[in-house]
Amino acid sequence: WNKGVSILHFLGGNSVELSASGTRAISQTKMTITQRGLVDGFECDVVCTGRFYDFMEKREGRWGVVLRQPIYEKDRINPLDPSANFKLDQDLLLSFPEGYRHLAYIQTKLGFKVKEDMPQLKGAAVEGLYQRGRDWLNHA
């Protein structure tokens, strides 16, 4: 809280793909991340939508999440005051991946180090994740 971190994760619809053995699964859950914070003196909300891509396994009769990987699809930033003369540093903004660039922008402005190789809607990172998911299901 002292660094201006006010974040909420909202979970939406879910789909599950089971392995042939019935002991492993890939679960995808729609999610929205909202973060409020100060950016260059303006209070702003960032909204980022995506999915949680979960590797799940049944062990000793109970299901659990083995790995959760977010996939960032798109985001936006809005000043709380719609009349604010609000300008983002375009060089900084465009240095971040498209799927979560506004979320990365506010977090960087708040002093956090942001990973820049996270899976997005398209690209090598998400294709690699999907392949890992197929391998997970096929080697159950």
Report each predicted region and the residues it spans.
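Acidic surface patches and DE-rich sequence motifs
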Residues: 19, 39, 59
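Terminal "cap-and-tail" regions of soluble proteins that handle hydrophobic small molecules
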Residues: 40, 62-140
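Beta-strand elements of well-folded, non-transmembrane domains
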Residues: 31-37, 56-58
